[in-house]
């Protein structure tokens, strides 16, 4: 890989569902290993990488609320699911020699370090992949919002959203074969059209901090490196 990367520091957001692979629940280790290899390729380009992973493959807090339970407790359970996923990705990274660390928004010192903005940026300056677990540490906020928040805190050049499809569409392309795919949008267009890429709080936070959002398929081998070199198929959300 000789192409010059377009970004020096990025925040990668991956859904928990991506880790399931073809399974209906949990973690497919082969998928975690493939994502780890994509991150290794990004590091080989000299790009500093932070990661936020959702927890939907294990638990969703809204599932508790939808059945009459306590949303706060449900969200706390979801935060713990993100820690499990983060530890799985760290394991996959370590297997291939990529130095990484998990920083949790919820203190659990026997398992991983607690998040601080200063420590996170210090680790990234050292070349470590930093995996941010525990969401924002607060209920009622999605891991998309956590990704936008961490991207702002580490001064990321871009927020990359690895999804099930190769960009943003006017409708779900799996349900609507006539859905239109966008190459480029502004943050305002995403918000005004209500396009399903990230929740509105995440898009608004990225917009306020002038962070472009790049949506691509996380299932393409080497896709992350291609995106970083400006070669991949994606949708870019930017006001510039």
Curated annotation (Swiss-Prot):
| Coarse class of the protein's main subcellular location | cytoplasm
- Name the positions where ATP binds: 13-16, 56, 60, 163-164, 169, 172
Can you supply a Gene Ontology BP term from the record? UDP biosynthetic process
One of the entry's Gene Ontology molecular-function terms is: ATP binding
Biological pathway: Pyrimidine metabolism; CTP biosynthesis via de novo pathway; UDP from UMP (UMPK route): step 1/1
Q: Does the keyword DNA repair apply?
A: no
Q: Where does UMP bind?
A: 55, 75, 136-143
What are the protein's UniProt keywords? Allosteric enzyme, ATP-binding, Cytoplasm, Kinase, Nucleotide-binding, Pyrimidine biosynthesis, Transferase
Per the UniProt record, which EC number(s) apply here? Answer: 2.7.4.22
State the top-level EC class: transferase
* Catalysed reaction equations from the record: UMP + ATP = UDP + ADP
Give GO cellular component annotations, separated by semicolons.
Answer: cytosol
Q: What subcellular locations does the record give?
A: Cytoplasm
Q: Where is this region: Involved in allosteric activation by GTP?
A: 21-26
Quaternary structure and partners: Homohexamer.
Q: What does this protein do?
A: Catalyzes the reversible phosphorylation of UMP to UDP.
Question: PANTHER family attached here?
Answer: URIDYLATE KINASE, URIDYLATE KINASE PUMPKIN, CHLOROPLASTIC
Quote the protein name from its UniProt record.
Uridylate kinase
Native source species = Brucella abortus biovar 1 (strain 9-941)
Q: Which lineage do the record's taxonomy fields give for this organism?
A: Bacteria, Pseudomonadati, Pseudomonadota, Alphaproteobacteria, Hyphomicrobiales
């Amino acid at each position: 890989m000789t192409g010059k990367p377009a970004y020096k520091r990025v925040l990668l957001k991956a859904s928990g569902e991506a880790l399931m692979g073809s399974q209906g629940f949990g973690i497919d280790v082969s998928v975690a290993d493939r994502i780890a290899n994509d991150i290794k390729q990004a590091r080989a380009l000299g790009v500093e990488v932070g990661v936020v992973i959702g927890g939907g493959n294990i638990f969703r807090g809204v599932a508790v609320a939808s059945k009459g339970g306590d949303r706060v407790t449900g969200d706390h359970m979801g935060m713990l699911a993100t820690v499990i996923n983060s530890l799985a990705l760290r394991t996959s990274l370590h297997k291939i020699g990529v130095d990484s660390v998990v920083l949790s928004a919820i203190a659990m010192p026997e398992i991983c370090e607690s998040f601080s903005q200063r420590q996170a940026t210090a680790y990234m300056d050292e070349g470590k992949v930093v995996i941010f677990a525990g969401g924002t540490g607060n209920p009622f906020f999605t891991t998309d919002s956590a990704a936008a928040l961490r991207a702002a805190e580490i001064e990321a050049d871009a927020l990359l959203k690895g999804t099930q499809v190769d960009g943003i569409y006017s409708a779900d392309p799996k349900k609507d074969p006539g859905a239109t795919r966008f190459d480029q949008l502004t943050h305002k267009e995403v918000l005004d059209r209500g396009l399903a890429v990230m929740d509105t709080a995440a898009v608004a936070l990225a917009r306020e901090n002038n962070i472009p959002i790049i949506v691509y398929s996380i299932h393409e081998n080497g896709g992350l490196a291609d995106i970083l070199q400006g070669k991949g198929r994606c949708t870019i959300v930017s006001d510039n």
